[in-house]
């Protein structure tokens, strides 16, 4: 159904509990992030329903998330492309928000959009093409950008980033606190979980600062808030649940499933979370209280053909 020689869109209208995975079909021998953009659709029982081959993309489709209107968003940050898919399963026309490497988004109840700029500086990832800013030898500024529901730019938040080993990552993951007063975010494989006050437009104290050097794998990766304000935080082969002060409430060890949990999202039932492991290519459905793995999906794309870069659930 979903091979590079048979690119037929079979995505179905969204149903409550459907799971969506960003999993580009990699097919370039030189560029290890390049291929045919693809979003896989599964039902709530984790049975495959369909596939959407994304238009206008050339590299990894990452950062899947839903807005309050049930539209699915995704990103090809390599080419400054923002993807939107309507609840009927049809991709909406691509809107060019900005010449920026947006890789994630979060939303407020007023319909405003807050994009995380996934790239920073001018040190490119050596294995893949990354588009520069127009007229500049620069990948990005690593900021957060606010747009209104008419897609008009409103404000740029010049946020802090956390140094990381590769020197090109900016705001790679972001999540809106339930109060809608601030955004919590990370620089993937950096040492910090950071917060920015979007009401007062100011950097807040870091929520988490990890010890060690940039090569020791003691790193911050993905974050996502639970509705009650607890924070999910992935650490490679496990994830933590943090309180509002950044203290660890609980730890779920998933080491038997490998290192590389690059995305995490809470399930709508309040009892489970979904994790995306970019190295193994496997999505896990995990009980939040016990850590029991109750379901999984193997995308078939693992190291070196790693492309599993997003997981989202349609809540109806």
What are these regions (language model features)?
Residues 5-15, 56-68, 98-110, 116-121, ...:
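Beta-rich, blade/repeat-based domains predominating
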Residues 278-316:
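Blade-level signature of beta-propeller repeat domains, shared across WD40, Kelch, NHL, RCC1
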Residues 25-26, 78, 119-120, 189, ...:
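Residue-level signature of beta-propeller blades and closely related beta-rich strand-turn architectures
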Residues 47-55, 90-96, 153-165, 202-215, ...:
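A short beta-strand motif characteristic of beta-propeller blades
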Residues 1-50:
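An edge-strand/N-cap motif at the start of beta-rich repeat modules
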Residues 18-21, 72-74, 112-114, 182-185, ...:
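Conserved beta-propeller blade signature
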Residues 36-40, 81-83, 142-145, 192-194, ...:
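A short loop-to-beta-strand structural motif that recurs across blades of beta-propeller domains
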Residues 17, 21-34, 116-139:
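Short, conserved, GDST-rich strand-edge loop motifs in beta-rich repeat architectures
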């Amino acid at each position: 159904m979903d091979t590079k020689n048979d690119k037929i869109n079979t995505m179905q209208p969204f149903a409550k509990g459907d799971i969506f995975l960003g999993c580009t079909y990699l097919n370039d021998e030189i560029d290890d992030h390049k291929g045919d953009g693809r979003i896989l659709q599964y039902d709530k029982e984790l049975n495959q329903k369909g596939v959407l081959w994304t238009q206008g993309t050339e590299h990894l489709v990452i950062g899947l998330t839903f807005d309050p209107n049930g539209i699915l968003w995704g990103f090809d940050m390599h080419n400054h492309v923002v993807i939107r898919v309507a609840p009927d399963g049809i991709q909406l026309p691509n809107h060019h928000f900005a010449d920026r490497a947006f890789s994630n988004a979060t939303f407020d109840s007023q319909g405003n959009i807050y994009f995380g700029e996934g790239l920073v500086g001018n040190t490119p990832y050596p294995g893949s093409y990354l588009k520069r800013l127009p007229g500049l030898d620069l990948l990005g500024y690593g900021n957060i950008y606010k747009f209104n529901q008419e897609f008009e730019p409103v404000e740029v938040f010049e946020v802090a980033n956390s140094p990381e080993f590769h020197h090109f990552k900016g705001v790679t993951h972001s999540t809106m606190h339930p109060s809608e007063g601030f955004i919590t975010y990370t620089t993937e494989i950096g040492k910090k979980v950071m917060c920015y006050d979007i009401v007062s437009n100011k950097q807040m104290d870091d929520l988490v600062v990890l010890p060690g050097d940039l090569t020791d794998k003691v790193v911050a990766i993905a974050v996502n808030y639970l509705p009650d304000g607890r924070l999910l935080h992935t650490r490679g082969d496990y994830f933590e649940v943090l309180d509002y002060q950044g203290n660890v409430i609980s730890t779920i060890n998933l080491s038997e499933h490998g290192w590389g949990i690059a995305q995490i999202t809470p399930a709508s039932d309040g009892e489970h979370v979904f994790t995306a492991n970019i190295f193994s290519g496997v999505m896990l459905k995990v009980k939040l209280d016990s850590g029991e793995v109750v379901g999984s999906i193997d995308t078939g794309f693992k190291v070196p053909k790693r492309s599993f870069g997003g997981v989202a659930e349609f809540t109806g």
